C-alpha cells in the first residue's frame, strides 16, 4: 500500500510502498477514503513536543474509511462498515481515569499517527473499540476533520461549563476555531470571536458569531468587558501564548478559560485576580469516545460543517509547508481517490 512515512524529524515525508497491516485480536483494518491534516501531525513530524514519536512512523489521526478485515473477538463492527480513526487509538481501560470516563487522560494510552501508525496511508490498523461510527448521511471528506478538530473544540466547549444563553469567546478562528463557532451556536451559546485576521472574523460573523474583535488593533478584553460584561467562558484554539493571556481578561467573574491550542511557551496568571474573580483555568485534550460520537452526530445533523479542501497524499509535504506559514484556510483533507 502507499503511505507517507517520516524517517527523521524535520525532514520531508517519503511516499513509499509498505505492507498492508494484518489485524490481531480486537483490531480492524480500515481502507482509507479520507484523512484530515491536523497541526498535531506537523508537531509529530517536527518532533517538537516534549513527548516524541519514534521514527519511522506514519502520521495522521483524522481517518475515515471502510473496514476490510476484522480480527478475533471483534463483534460490534464488521467488514464494510464506515468508521473513523481518531487520535485516541486505545487506552488501558482499568486505571482511575479510564474507569471514570476520562480515557483521554490515561497514562498508558496510544495515539494514532504518533505512538502507532496513522491514517496517512491507504490502509490503517485500528483498535475496534476506539473507532467512531460514521453516520450514513455524511460525506467522508467533510466529516474527517470532526475526528480531531471537531471533537477537540466540542469537548473544550463542554469544559467551559457554559449553558444556553451564556457568552463564550472563541479565540483563534482557524481550523479548530471555525468549527468551535458552529458547535457553540449549536449548543445555544452566544459567540464572541477573536482573531487578528479580518477575513477570519468576517467568516466567524457569517457562521453566526454575534460579536467579533480584531485583537491586532483593539484590546479584546476591554472591548468585551464593555460590550457584553465579559464572557462566561473562553475557548482558546490559537497557537499564540498571548491569546491565552488575553483570554483571561475577557472573562467575567466566575468565568472559565479552556485551553485547546498548544503553542510553545507560557502565559502569566495573576494569582490575585484569579482568586478574587473566581476564575477557572482548564486544559482540554481531544475528547472521549462519547464526545467523539456526539460531535459526529451533531455534524451529521447539519449543525456543523468544516470548511475543507481536498488534496492527494502526494501533496503532504507542501501542505505542511503551508501550515507552517499559516496559509491554510479551514482544513485540508487527503482524498484517497485522487
UniProtKB/Swiss-Prot annotation:
Its EC number is 1.1.1.1. Zn(2+) 2 binds at residues 92, 95, 98, 106. InterPro entries: ADH-like_C, ADH-like_N, ADH_Zn_CS, GroES-like_sf, NAD(P)-bd_dom_sf, PKS_ER. Its cofactor is Zn(2+). The gene is adh. Homotetramer. Is a very thermostable, cold-adapted enzyme. Is active from 10 to at least 53 degrees Celsius and unfolds at 89 degrees Celsius. Belongs to the zinc-containing alcohol dehydrogenase family. It is an enzyme of class 1 (oxidoreductase). Binds 2 Zn(2+) ions per subunit. One metal ion is located at the active-site region and has been termed catalytic, while the second metal ion has been termed structural. Each subunit comprises two distinct structural domains: the catalytic domain (residues 1-150 and 288-340/345) and the nucleotide-binding domain (residues 151-287). The keyword Transferase does not apply. Psychrophilic alcohol dehydrogenase that exhibits a wide range of substrate specificity, oxidizing mainly primary and secondary aliphatic alcohols, utilizing NAD(+) as a cosubstrate. In vitro, shows highest reaction rates for ethanol as a substrate and gradually decreases its reaction rates as the length and branching of the carbon chain of the alcohol substrates increase. To a lesser extent, is also able to reduce aldehydes and ketones. Do not catalyze the further oxidation of aldehydes to carboxylic acids. Cannot use NADP(+) instead of NAD(+). Zn(2+) 1 binds at residues 38, 61-62, 148. Keywords: Metal-binding, NAD, Oxidoreductase, Zinc. It comes from Moraxella sp. (strain TAE123). It holds the Pfam family ADH_zinc_N. Optimum pH is 7.4 and 6.0 for the oxidation of ethanol and reduction of acetone, respectively. This is Alcohol dehydrogenase.
Amino acid at each position: 500500500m502507499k503511505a507517507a512515512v517520516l524517517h527523521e524529524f524535520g525532514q520531508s515525508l517519503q511516499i513509499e510502498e509498505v505492507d498492508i497491516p494484518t489485524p490481531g485480536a480486537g483490531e480492524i483494518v480500515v481502507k482509507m477514503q479520507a484523512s484530515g491534516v491536523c497541526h498535531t501531525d506537523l508537531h509529530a513530524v517536527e518532533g517538537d513536543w516534549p513527548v516524541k514519536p519514534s521514527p519511522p512512523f506514519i502520521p495522521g489521526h483524522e481517518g475515515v474509511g471502510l473496514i476490510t478485515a476484522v480480527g478475533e473477538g471483534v463483534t460490534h463492527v464488521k467488514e464494510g462498515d464506515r468508521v473513523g480513526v481518531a487520535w485516541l487509538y486505545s487506552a488501558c481501560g482499568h486505571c482511575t481515569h479510564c474507569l471514570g470516563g476520562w480515557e483521554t487522560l490515561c497514562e498508558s494510552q496510544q495515539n494514532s499517527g504518533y505512538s502507532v501508525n496513522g491514517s496517512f496511508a491507504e490502509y490503517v490498523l485500528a483498535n475496534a473499540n476506539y473507532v467512531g461510527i460514521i453516520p450514513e448521511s455524511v460525506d467522508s471528506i467533510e466529516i474527517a476533520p470532526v475526528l480531531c478538530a471537531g471533537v477537540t473544540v466540542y469537548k473544550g466547549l463542554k469544559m467551559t461549563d457554559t449553558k444556553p444563553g451564556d457568552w463564550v469567546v472563541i479565540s483563534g478562528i482557524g481550523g479548530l476555531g471555525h468549527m468551535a463557532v458552529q458547535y457553540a451556536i449549536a449548543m445555544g451559546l452566544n459567540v464572541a470571536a477573536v482573531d487578528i485576521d479580518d477575513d477570519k472574523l468576517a467568516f466567524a460573523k457569517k457562521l453566526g458569531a454575534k460579536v467579533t474583535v480584531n485583537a491586532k488593533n483593539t484590546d479584546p478584553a476591554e472591548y468585551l468587558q464593555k460590550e457584553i460584561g465579559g464572557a462566561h467562558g473562553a475557548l482558546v484554539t490559537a497557537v499564540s501564548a498571548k491569546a491565552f493571556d488575553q483570554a483571561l481578561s475577557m472573562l467575567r467573574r466566575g468565568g472559565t478559560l479552556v485551553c485547546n491550542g498548544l503553542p510553545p511557551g507560557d502565559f502569566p496568571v495573576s494569582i490575585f485576580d484569579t482568586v478574587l474573580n473566581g476564575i477557572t483555568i482548564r486544559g482540554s485534550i481531544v475528547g472521549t469516545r462519547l464526545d467523539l460520537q456526539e460531535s459526529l452526530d451533531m455534524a451529521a445533523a447539519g449543525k456543523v460543517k468544516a470548511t475543507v479542501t481536498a488534496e492527494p497524499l502526494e501533496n503532504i509535504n507542501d501542505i505542511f509547508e503551508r501550515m507552517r506559514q499559516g496559509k491554510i484556510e479551514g482544513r485540508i483533507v487527503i482524498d484517497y481517490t485522487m
